[in-house]
Every structure is written in structure tokens, then in C-alpha cells.
UniProtKB/Swiss-Prot annotation:
Belongs to the complex I subunit 1 family. The gene is ndhA. It comes from the Eukaryota. Keywords: Chloroplast, Membrane, NAD, NADP, Plastid, Plastoquinone, Quinone, Thylakoid, Translocase, Transmembrane, Transmembrane helix. This is NAD(P)H-quinone oxidoreductase subunit 1, chloroplastic. HAMAP family: NDH1_NuoH (MF_01350). It comes from Piper cenocladum. GO terms for molecular function: NADH dehydrogenase activity; oxidoreductase activity, acting on NAD(P)H, quinone or similar compound as acceptor; quinone binding.
Length: 363
């Protein structure tokens, strides 16, 4: 049997081209993910720097000023130090749970960013159940904290892990009920659709005016989910040394540090998306840019402006969260649980029932 060499070469060339297409497709698929991770990292560094500057201003002292101009590189210096510190393991602890816990806490929060729309065309995954995916994924983080507390074989760590789980359950329910109210108003669970519904009437179409009670409950619950003062009971220094972080050092301790700020950023982003119109702005900025001859119809211009508006609103709430941390004292554990179960839960449930009633009457 005579084999045609021309056909063999054609087949080999075709297979190589198909393999090249698969590689290019894989790279093209990873580019948005890597871009999002890079943007999240930069956002965390900015939050750390802002918190140090704001806290220094509130306490009337000088903040970081040596590492870079205005101390902007201080967070990078601290992260580098933690990266090269020794990773100490507890001798009688569960090493597997101890090592897996920080990773679960960070990964579950990073996955939440996949459904956040920074602009109409700038979202990693436009899912029909976007807000529920965020709630479901963020509920995994307390499991990692509980694993860390149990795996440390330390009474302070275990108490901190139990507090983190109890606090998360207490405030996850009111937060979910507030999200359900927003979904009923928008007739959708997609984050893109929720923002688009708010764009019809400018600033007066924001869910802030349609759900003022839900906004307050959501804001308090999101702060409690981030375990920030006055809700930082799981890592209260005076009672539990450092809570579930007590036995950690090096990069694993740094992961908890990063997870805290990642959670704060994602909560502020969802406040912007759900209640403050996302990338929409009532000010007619397009006419202002038109005076300078800037092409307003291009997709790049719209995406850039949408991302800028979203981040501007987000960092406003970050400022409020940071100022709250350095202003209010810590609550007791019984006060924290009573606030969640006896106050926020009935209010959020009543808000959901009222929203459902109004939606049924409007049909």
C-alpha cells in the first residue's frame, strides 16, 4: 500500500493547527481570570494603605511614610515579610485541617468576584443566579475558619472558630433576605439585570430609595460578615489572643489577612451593585466629555467610565467601613447574637413580606 506523503503532511499540518488553536483558546480563557486576580490584588493593597492613612488621621498620628511615597508600598513590604517567614505547625494539631483552612477562606471569597459587574461588558460570568452564587460561595468561608480553629489544637483558636461560624450563620440569613427583596423588585437574580433595572430613572431609580430598611440591614450584616469592628468577636485580642489565627505564622497568617480585606471589598462592591446603581451615574458626564471631542460611543470609553464609577462608589463604602472600625467599640457576644437573631432577622423578614405584597399588588 502506497501512502501519499502530501496527505500525511496535510494531516500533520491540520493537527498542529488544531493544537495551536486549543492552546490559544486556553490562554484567551485564562486572560480574564488573571486580569481579575491582578485587579483584586491591587485593590487589596489600596484598601490596606487607605485604612492605615484613615486610622492615622482619626487617631491624630502619622501613618506609614517610609516605604515608598506616602507609605504606599508598606503593604507590599509587609506581604513580602510574611512570605519569607517560617511556617510553624502545631505539634499536636491536625496538620491537614490547619493547612487547608486558610486556602478555603480565600478561595471562597475570590470566587465571589466572578459575578460582580464592574461595567455592562466587564463581568467574568453573567449568570442567571449571580447573587445566589455569591451567597452560596461566601457561606463556605466560615467552614475554613472552623477547620483552622479545630486544627490548631488551641482553646483560643477553637473558640474563635466557633464564634466565626455562629456569627456567620446569624448574619447570613438577614443578608440573604435583603438580597431576595432586591431580586423581587428586579425580577431577576442576575447582577447585570439588577443594575439595569436601577438605570431607568437615574438616581431616583436606585434601590436605596426603594429599599431603605433593607439597605441598612444589608450594610450591618455585611460588616458582621467581614468580622470588622464592632463585630470582630472571633479574633478579639483581649479575650482570644488572635482567635482562629493564634497558631498561624508566615504566608498562612497572611492569607487570613488578605481574606479579611477581600471580603470587605466584595461586600462594598455588592452594596454598590444592589443598592447604588452599579456603573450608572445620574450626572450627564457624556455631554461633558463630548465638549472635548471624546468618542462616547466606543465600547472602551463606556467600559472604562463604568468601572471608574463602580469603584468610586465602592471606595466610598470602604471609607465608611474603615471609619466605623476606628470609631465604635466592640460588642459582647450576646449583644452580637441578639442583634442578628432578635432585631435584624425580624426586620429583614418583614421587609421581604412587604416587598412581596407590593409586587403582587402591582401585577
Amino acid at each position: 500500500m502506497i501512502i501519499d506523503t502530501t496527505k500525511v503532511q496535510a494531516i500533520n499540518s491540520f493537527s498542529r493547527s488544531e493544537s495551536l488553536k486549543e492552546v490559544i483558546g486556553l490562554i484567551w480563557m485564562l486572560v480574564p481570570i488573571l486580569t481579575l486576580v491582578l485587579a483584586i490584588t491591587i485593590g487589596v493593597l489600596v484598601i490596606v494603605w487607605l485604612e492605615r492613612q484613615i486610622s492615622a488621621g482619626i487617631q491624630q498620628r502619622i501613618g506609614p511614610e517610609y516605604a515608598g511615597p506616602l507609605g504606599i508600598l508598606q503593604a507590599i513590604a509587609d506581604g513580602t515579610k510574611l512570605l519569607f517567614k517560617e511556617d510553624i505547625l502545631p505539634s499536636r494539631g491536625d496538620i491537614r485541617l490547619f493547612s487547608i483552612g486558610p486556602s478555603i477562606a480565600v478561595i471562597s471569597i475570590i470566587l465571589s468576584y466572578s459575578v460582580i459587574p464592574f461595567s455592562y461588558h466587564l463581568v467574568l460570568a453573567d449568570l442567571g443566579i449571580g447573587v445566589f452564587l455569591w451567597i452560596a460561595v461566601s457561606s463556605i468561608a466560615p467552614i475554613g475558619l472552623l477547620m483552622s480553629g479545630y486544627g490548631s489544637n488551641n482553646k483560643y483558636s477553637f473558640s474563635g472558630g466557633l464564634r466565626a461560624a455562629a456569627q456567620s450563620i446569624s448574619y447570613e440569613i438577614p443578608l440573604t433576605l435583603c438580597v431576595l427583596s432586591i431580586s423581587l423588585l428586579s425580577n431577576s437574580l442576575s447582577t447585570i439585570d439588577i443594575v439595569e433595572v436601577q438605570s431607568k430613572y437615574g438616581i431616583w431609580g436606585w434601590n436605596l430609595w426603594r429599599q431603605p430598611v433593607g439597605f441598612i440591614v444589608f450594610l450591618i450584616s455585611s460588616l458582621a460578615e467581614c468580622e470588622r469592628l464592632p463585630f470582630d468577636l472571633p479574633e478579639a485580642e483581649e479575650e482570644l489572643v488572635a482567635g482562629y489565627q493564634t497558631e498561624y505564622s508566615g504566608i498562612k497568617f497572611g492569607l487570613f489577612y488578605v481574606a479579611s480585606y477581600l471580603n470587605l471589598l466584595v461586600s462594598s462592591l455588592f452594596v454598590t451593585v444592589l443598592y447604588f446603581g452599579g456603573w450608572n451615574l445620574s450626572i450627564p458626564y457624556t455631554s461633558i466629555f463630548g465638549l472635548f471631542g471624546i468618542n462616547q460611543t466606543s465600547g472602551v470609553f463606556g467600559t472604562t467610565m463604568g468601572m471608574f464609577i463602580t469603584l468610586a462608589k465602592t471606595y466610598l463604602f470602604l471609607f465608611i467601613s474603615v471609619a466605623t472600625r476606628w470609631t465604635l467599640p466592640r460588642m459582647r457576644m450576646d449583644q452580637l447574637l441578639n442583634l442578628g437573631w432578635k432585631f435584624l432577622l425580624p426586620i429583614s423578614l418583614g421587609n421581604l413580606l412587604l416587598t412581596t405584597s407590593f409586587q403582587l399588588l402591582s401585577l
